[in-house]
UniProtKB/Swiss-Prot annotation:
Keywords on record: Cell inner membrane, Cell membrane, Membrane, Transmembrane, Transmembrane helix
Protein name: UPF0283 membrane protein YE2117
Domain of life: Bacteria
Gene Ontology terms: cellular component: plasma membrane
Membrane-spanning segments: 71-91, 101-121, 214-234
Predominant cellular place of this UniProt entry's protein: membrane
Natural source organism: Yersinia enterocolitica serotype O:8 / biotype 1B (strain NCTC 13174 / 8081)
Topological category with respect to the lipid bilayer: Multi-pass membrane protein
Length: 354
């Protein structure tokens, strides 16, 4: 017995042809492009993206040059020239008329103006030094992907002089002994980053650990919130100054404000996700709520924020970018803070219980 025929199926729309992927046209590379080809580095791309975003925000925060601003600048310049010309005229008249009081007052005013100009020049020089450090990091990034020879050693020796390392420093001697004529710029800079730079980074880490511990203990034992905020602000500024001095940067008023702003912007860019990830990794497993008081928990939070501030200050003051796992992690400082609070707070509570 034959099977019954299936009924006919009518489709509302005609069948569409299968869409084939569109292939790109062939691209031929010349010999020069093949020799200068480098594989993509995800860490370097992330650093470049972070620097690009930071530059965009800094450009957005800078006031735009307008016609009124130019007119005000020209007016101030003309006023300064007029004041100088009038002062010279007063000095000449006072000398001819033997008016010693007017001559003394004019001389005192001139000394004050010279002191002000000197302060402005000094601040500009320190601010320029801070900007130059960012340019040195860009040069270091270029050398870390370069296969040339000759520029890496001179660059690293310049960094050593800026850091105040003499030729007799053990780390610098080990680096010089490890160099060979066949090393390219990338290998020379990597050796410097592994042998010389850690000597400065370890000092900065020790300062961050000490300041973070002091902030945590102060918050944990102090009953006054206003005193806590003033103390934390003062210690954080001291920490930034100390880290900058370790890396050979002398901060002035404006350069200190700029560095502090860059640090805060860097923290804002990273967001709270990194802080939550680092702090919350083993927060619940250690059951800190049962072991430490609420004030101690607040102290840990303040200490971690101080440590994060110090890490970002290190990143902005270092002449070299981070390589691999060299960047300090909040987890290292977290364990130190928890251990110090556990050892300190029970000692303070035992006499009260007795």
């Amino acid at each position: 017995m034959s099977e019954p025929l299936k009924p006919r199926i009518d489709f509302e729309q005609p069948l569409q042809p299968i869409d084939e992927p569109v292939l790109k046209a062939a691209q031929a590379f010349d010999q020069h492009a093949a020799e200068n080809f480098y594989p993509a580095d995800p860490e370097l791309d992330a650093e470049n993206e972070e620097g690009r975003v930071e530059g965009l925000v800094n450009a957005a925060l800078k006031p735009k040059r307008s016609l009124w601003r130019k007119m005000v600048t020209v007016g101030i310049a003309l006023f300064g020239v007029s004041v100088i010309a009038q002062s010279v005229q007063w000095v000449n008249q006072a000398w001819q008329q033997q008016d010693w009081i007017a001559l003394g007052a004019t001389t005192a005013g001139g000394l004050i103006v010279l002191a002000g100009v000197g302060s402005v020049v000094t601040e500009w020089r320190r601010l320029y030094r801070l900007r130059q450090r960012a340019e040195e990091r860009d040069i270091a990034r270029e050398l870390l992907v370069s296969h040339g020879i000759g520029q890496g050693r001179a660059f690293c020796e310049k960094l050593a002089r800026q850091a105040g390392l003499d030729q007799g420093h053990p780390a610098l001697q080990r680096w010089q002994a490890s160099l060979h004529e066949t090393h390219n710029d990338r290998e020379v800079v990597e050796l410097y980053a592994k042998l010389v730079q850690p000597s400065l980074d370890n000092l900065a880490r020790a300062e961050i650990s000490r300041y973070a511990a002091e902030s945590a203990l102060m918050i944990a034992v102090s009953p006054l919130a206003l005193v806590d905020m003033a103390f934390i602000a003062w210690r954080n500024i001291r920490l930034i100054n100390r880290i900058a001095a370790l890396y050979g940067i002398e901060l002035g008023y404006f350069s200190r404000i700029r560095l502090f702003r860059l640090v805060l912007l860097n923290i804002a860019f990273a967001g709270a996700s990194e802080l939550v990830r680092e702090v919350g990794m083993d927060w619940l497993s250690q059951d800190l709520a049962a072991r430490l008081s609420a004030r101690a928990a607040q102290g840990i939070g303040a200490g971690l924020l101080t440590a994060r501030l110090g890490i970002k200050a290190m990143e902005l003051c270092r002449p070299l970018p981070w390589l691999g796992d060299d960047k300090p992690k909040l987890g290292d400082f977290r364990r130190q803070l928890i251990g110090q609070l556990k050892n300190t707070l029970p000692k303070k509570d035992k006499p009260a219980q007795q």
